Regions:
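Acidic/His- and Gly-rich active-site-bordering loop/insert found
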Residues: 1-102, 107, 111-114, 118-126
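Divalent metal-coordination and catalytic microenvironments
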Residues: 21, 61, 76, 106, ...
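Active-site beta-loop-alpha junctions enriched in small/polar residues
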Residues: 26, 79-81, 137, 167, ...
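Conserved acidic residues
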Residues: 48, 158-159, 344
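Histidine/acidic-residue-rich, glycine-tolerant segments that coordinate divalent metal ions
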Residues: 59, 82-85, 89-101, 107-108, ...
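Non-cysteine beta-strand/loop elements that form the S-adenosyl-L-methionine
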Residues: 75-77, 86, 189, 347-352
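Metal-dependent amide/peptide-bond hydrolase catalytic core
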Residues: 211-388
């Protein structure tokens, strides 16, 4: 990889940070140790500002270039939280906390951004301001939204925002991204079906919620195939089916379904919600039952803007072995989406080699990907804000 030589020198130090984070995983907003170490290191690097407590437990660092005459302000983001998973890697530096694991590589993301921060603080070879966003609670807590709601973009005048995520299956040295939806929105629904309980021997005197809910499940799975344009990506999954009966000779009075819908655009996101409600309510009504639908919006689409993708790709081509600027979108979700709703920006995938997929107990972050991640952040800042 044509990465910057300085990161080859810094790799042992950055790797040690990463391994320390890996040994001490923290969940959601409870990232006090991690955030404290980030704050300590940013201060030691000589950042112009280091502000904790943004978005509850997020940390912001500010690095000014040799000049700030350009007025440009670019934000770089890394997530800090781990997952409630019991680690099965067998690593010497495996999690010391049973039931908690950095199974998505956020320890690597945090270490990469710290490495970039150290370099940028040393060199300051740019005309403008870099804002470092160390974010809690990506794994379901919407920490990105919390930082945006806390005014991080306005307080520091951020104009563009960039982030990365390691990607198992992509070779180390490879960077991939795309214009538009890179990762899906993720919404959840719950459908409570109420009928009329009764004896299994007298179904004519009951309204069988098991039957009604089963028909709803079948009909829900026709939404994607029969109402969504086939060139668009939408995933609908019913994940749980429960009734209030545990006996074989009882017709349940109530049944409950829970599921998720993932889309890559706002139009289909709205369409999916409308159709789920209509299918559930109308199907239940046809059987003489009722259906109450509770829709819980989750993360939006991670929607990269065209100009910023072009900048991200240009920087990537300067430091990576290979770059895919038109990678296919994938259907997991990511709360960097909230930052992209607030400002133009781009999110990239950083090759993590041949390992178990994210969220698997055997997942491993590849430390050899660190220099490229650091180099990309630095290259991006220096190209977007060239020194005079």
């Amino acid at each position: 990889m044509p990465v910057r030589n300085r990161f080859a020198e810094l790799l042992p130090e950055i790797t040690a940070w990463r391994h320390d984070f890996h040994e001490h995983p923290e969940l959601m907003y409870d990232v006090h140790r991690t955030a404290g170490l980030v704050q300590e290191r940013l201060t030691a690097f000589g950042c112009d500002e280091v502000v904790p407590g943004i978005g509850k437990t997020g940390v912001v660092g500010v690095i000014k270039g040799k000049s700030t005459a350009s007025g440009k302000v670019i934000a770089l983001r890394a997530d800090m939280d781990a997952l409630p998973i019991h680690e099965e890697t067998g690593l010497e530096y495996a999690s010391k906390t049973p039931g908690k694991m950095h199974a998505c590589g956020h320890d690597g993301h945090t270490a990469i951004l710290l490495g970039a921060a150290k370099y940028l603080s040393e060199t300051r070879n740019f005309d403008g301001t870099v804002v470092l966003l160390f974010q809690p609670a990506e794994e379901g807590g919407a920490g990105g939204k919390a930082m945006v709601d806390d005014g991080v973009m306005d307080r520091w005048g951020v104009q563009e925002v960039y982030g990365l995520h390691n990607m198992p299956g992509l070779p180390v040295g490879h960077i991939a991204t795309r214009v538009g939806g890179l990762l899906a929105s993720s919404d959840e629904f719950e459908i409570e079906v109420t009928g009329k309980g009764g004896h299994a021997a007298a179904p004519h005197d009951a309204i069988d919620t098991t039957l009604v809910a089963s028909q709803i499940v079948v009909s829900l799975h026709s939404i994607v195939s029969r109402t969504v344009n086939p060139i668009h990506r939408v995933v609908l999954t019913v994940g749980t089916f429960e009734t209030d009966s545990t006996a074989s000779n009882v017709i349940a009075h109530r049944a409950k379904l829970k599921g998720t819908v993932r889309t890559l655009d706002t139009e289909n996101r709205k369409l999916a919600e409308d159709r789920v409600r209509r299918v559930a309510e109308d199907t239940a009504s046809a059987f003489g039952a009722t259906a109450k639908v509770t829709w819980t919006p989750g993360y939006p689409v991670t929607d990269n803007t065209a100009d910023e993708v072009a900048h991200a790709v240009e920087a990537a081509r300067a430091v990576a072995d290979s770059v895919d600027p038109e990678t296919p979108p994938i259907m997991p979700s990511e709360d960097f989406a909230y930052m992209l709703e607030a400002r133009p920006g781009a999110y990239i995938f950083l090759g993590n080699g041949d390992t178990a997929m994210c969220h698997h107990p055997a997942y491993q972050f590849d430390d050899s990907a660190i220099p490229l991640g650091c180099s990309w952040f630095v290259e991006l800042c220096e190209r977007r804000m060239p020194a005079s």
